[in-house]
Every structure is written in structure tokens, then in C-alpha cells.
Amino acid sequence: MDKTLSREEAKQLMQLLCLDMSCWGNLPLMRRQYLVKCKEYHPDKGGNEESMKLLNSLYLKLQDSVSSVHDLNEEEDNIWQSSQIPTYGTPDWDEWWSQFNTYWEEELRCNESMPSSPKRSAPEEEPSCSQATPPKKKHAFDASLEFPKELLEFVSHAVFSNKCITCFVVHTTREKGEVLYKKLLQKYQCSFISKHAFYNTVLIFFLTPHKHRVSAINNFCKGHCTVSFLFCKGVNNPYGLYSRMCRQPFNLCEENIPGGLKENEFNPEDLFGEPKEPSLSWNQIANFALEFDIDDVYYLLGSYIRFATKPEECEKCSKNDDATHKRVHVQNHENAVLLQESKSQKNACTQAIDRVIAERRYNCLTLTRKKLLTKRFKKLFNEMDKIVVGERKILLYMASIAWYTGLNKKIDELVVRFLKLIVDNKPKHRYWLFKGPINSGKTTLATALLNLCGGKALNINIPSEKLPFELGVALDQYMVVFEDVKGQIGIEKQLPSGNGVNNLDNLRDYLDGCVEVNLEKKHVNKRSQIFPPGIVTMNEYCIPETVAVRFEKTVMFTIKRNLRESLEKTPQLLSQRILHSGIAMLLLLIWYRPVSDFDEEIQSNVVYWKEVLDNYIGLTEFATMQMNVTNGKNILEKWFE
């Protein structure tokens, strides 16, 4: 700054800026004051024009001078760069060195000559009086450089940890140790605290009645150690650390409890903090959702919170009708109470649903379709143990079998052929078309098959721009049903028109199953997979050839008056949704097909249910049911009068 303005000019500028000379060189401050004074001295603001001109000239001169000084310094700094200096010992370096010393040759030359010292006569040999150099004294050990190595096995080495503990050790200077000993005892109401000397430093060991983070203790101690060194550690083995600090090279200075810390005198709560309160187990909720294959957040939440009721006060448990419910209720009661009081109920259930979806996707990618179908049948058998109980229920399900037999005389062969189609999943041989007039039984049979195999029903009569998210429902599903697809032209004019057939024509890759297609859901990334096989149901619409060739089989339905009349007189089949259930279709296979047609894993279940059905109804009684269906009567007229 001395090279920028003269002394007089500098004083004059600082006076105009109304700053003391001690602020000379504080360029940011001078800049702010310059802007303030410009407004004050400006003629338009009523200021002095001469003062304004002088201020501008001096300040601009200062700026130019400062920039020129900086440029000069940069040039001086960049005269020689390390990249320009050759390697030492090479001819290039010798040449560079001679050039570098050219400018200094005259200034550093010395022409003086030293007079030669007079020659001394050779002294006579005298006994040597020299002695060995005494050994250097060892420097005193500085214990402030690192935490004592003797204690490392007892403390935590975590750098960043949110874990809360109750036992700590602090390493600092002797002076700060005196202060911190009292401050820590007062601040945290320590249940035990002791001070130990270690060379020229101090270690403070203490136990707190409540849990704290190591960072919280460290920050408190730092407030009293702005210059002095400080190490703060969490202790994993409290008694081991204390006993080690009572032996050399450590010395016990003082402690708040006479006699010190004894191994058996402290409860676990004193050493490791208050006992941990039971917390909500998200994993237990996920296991419950996996066991019952629940993929609905709100249904899972509602079902699980029911377990918060005490098992002895639960109606289902007291009836002893469902052993599974009682077992699950007892296992999940305590966790359900915690869920009921939790503020993250939905988050816990959402994670459980994610586990169910993840398990389903894993099975789809690793198990064969035959294994998946067998697993589905096992689930239905478990449901049958709870639902198909007692004579009345069994007769209702047998009535549904009689009704399906009236729909198609070879209904069992039709179902077996469809299951083979679904399991094989051959490209271009993966879909059946159920076609017929209104109220002919298409949707009833399609829904029963869907519930037998597991899957979703899709509506593709929507606009094409909404179709991707509707198709995304088929992610990880075993099969699908395109329900009630509408076309543009129908055999009967009263049929409404729709986009279904047109959309179906644009989904050839989905129907063929030759290539993977992209499926997407909201808030889920797109995923490529072979679209699942299934069924298409529609009324009597005209189908383009490009769509018709993609159906492996077309099943034509006709209106049968006796079927409608028998259903009207046996309303339980519809009101209890027995006809649409997968259990009814599985019992149909058990009734008609031999045991050998089933997978070996479930043949024992098939044998059991064949015996159950034979105990409640024989061939004569079943023939009576079929006759009632044919005549349009109440199917269970003989039993339920």
C-alpha cells in the first residue's frame, strides 16, 4: 500500500472518507465508505462538487496503483517456474545455473585473500585429554499427542455415531482437567466420576444417569478447551477401563465415590443406561403380511391393529373356530399394541407390503409356473380349512359344481386344458376367448378360473393414453382377464361400442408373449417382463383377423334359461360369491379328476378332501343336484327346504 499513494494523498483520501488512518489498506471498508460518501458529496444530492472530484481522482488513482502493484508482484513471482528448471546434474541444469548466477556475479564476488597461517612445528606427542560425548537426555514423553494406547481396547473407535451411551472418558491437560472434573459432575449429575493422571495430562472417567451422544459430551468439553487438546471417547467396557486407569502408568487423583468403582456394585442400568423400551417390530408386521399374502396397506393396518385387543377378550379366539387366528393373535398382540400407539403406522405397513411384492417378484423370476400354481393351490387348501366347514358349506360348494356341470358337460376337461395352457405359457398359444351373449356365464367362469390361478382383471375399454397404467397392474401376476372387451361393430345393434377391440389389436406383443414388454405403475420404474397369459371375455362383437389368430381357443357361450332360474332359486351361490371363488373351481377338480392328475406335493390334500366330500354327499345326491339345475329348480331343494 505504500507504493500506491503518497503520504499526503493518503491522508487526504482518508479524511474525505471520514476514516482513521489505522484503516488504511482495508480495501473492502474503504470501498463501502467510498460509495456512502459519493452519495453525500454528489452535487445532485446537495454536496460539494470539488470534494466529489477530489474523492474520485484519489480513489481511482488508488485502484490503478493497487492493480499495478499486484501485476508487478505476479511478474516477480513468475520469473522462474519449477517447470522451467532442468533436472539437477544434467548439462542443461549447468547451463541454466550459469545464466542464473550471471546477474549476481558482481555483487557476490569477493577478491579478498586470506593470509596463510604460520606453520607450527609438530607438537610432541601428549596424552589425549579428549572424552566421549555424553548421551543426550531423553525428551520427556508428551502424552497430549494421542489417546493412551493402553486404553484403546476399552473404548469405541467410531468416528461418527448417533448411538447414545452412558459411559465416557475425556483426555485433556492437567489445568483443564481440574475445570472439566467439576463442570461435568455439575452438568450431567454423574453417578460416578474419577480423575486420573497420565504423565503431563489428565483423564476423566464418568458415568451419567441418562444416555448421551459422544458428540454432545465432546461439544460441551470443547467450550472449555478452546486451545488445550481434547479427546472424548465412548466406553465399551466401563469397569475394565476404570481398573486399568488405577494401575501404572496411570495414577488415581480423585473420585466422587470413596472406594471407587466396584465390578458388582453397579446395576446394568448404571453402566449401560436405562433398559431399552420395547420398540415396534416392522419385521414382525412384514412376516404377518407375507404369511397371508396381503398387498393392501389399509387392509394390513386394519387387520394387524385388531390384534391389539387382548386374546382372552377376542371373540374369534374365544370361539376356537380358527386355530390359525388364535396363534397369530397371541404372537402379534404385543407388537400390535405398539403399532396402535406408533406415529408411523402407515410407514410400517407400507414397508411390509413392499416385502410382499418383493417376495412375489422373486418367486415369479425363480420358480417355474408349475411350482407357482402348486403354491397357489396350497394357499387355497389353507383357506378351505377355514371356510369350507360344516355340512351346509360343503353342500353349497357342491351345488356350485353341479351348476358348472350344467354350464358345460365337460367342465373338468375344459379347466384342465386351460390350466395346461397357463402353465405351459407357449408364445402365441396363451389366451382363450370367452364369447357369447349377455348373462351366458362368461364372466362367472372367467372369474372363477382367475381366482383359482391368481391374477388381476383388466379393463382395456379406456382411452389409449390411460392404457399403460392399467396394463401395469399385471406386474408379477400369474394370469390376467381382459373383462368385457367392447368393439365397434356387433352382431346385435343394441350392443354399446368401445375401444376395447381396437386397444387389443394394438397389444399384439402382449398377447403373443414372444418378447418382453414394458410395464409401469405410478411411483414405480418401468420393468420389462413377458406379459402374463389369460382370458378375454366379450359379447358378440366382430373381431378383426389380426386379433382372432392370437386366441388359442374360442369358447362360445349360449344363454341357458335353466341356469339363470336355478341361480335365482339358490341365491346363496351369488350372495356368498361361491360361484366366483377359486375354492369352488378347485373342489370341482377334486370331485371329477383322479388324484394322479395333481402334483405330488398336494396329493395328500386332494385325498383328504375327496374323503370329506364323499362323507357328506354321494353320487346319487349329486345327481339330484344336477337334475335340479336342469329343471331350473333350487339346487339344494332336498336339503334346504
UniProtKB/Swiss-Prot annotation:
Residues that coordinate or bind Zn(2+): 314, 317, 325, 329
Region annotation (Disordered) ranges: 114-136
SF3 helicase domain segment(s): 410-572
GO CC annotation: host cell nucleus
Intervals of motif LXCXE motif: 108-112
Post-translational modifications: Phosphorylated on both serine and threonine residues. Small t antigen inhibits the dephosphorylation by the AC form of PP2A.
GO terms, biological process: DNA replication; symbiont-mediated perturbation of host cell cycle G1/S transition checkpoint; symbiont-mediated suppression of host innate immune response; symbiont-mediated suppression of host JAK-STAT cascade via inhibition of JAK1 activity; symbiont-mediated suppression of host type I interferon-mediated signaling pathway
Protein name: Large T antigen
Organism: KI polyomavirus (isolate Stockholm 60) (KIPyV)
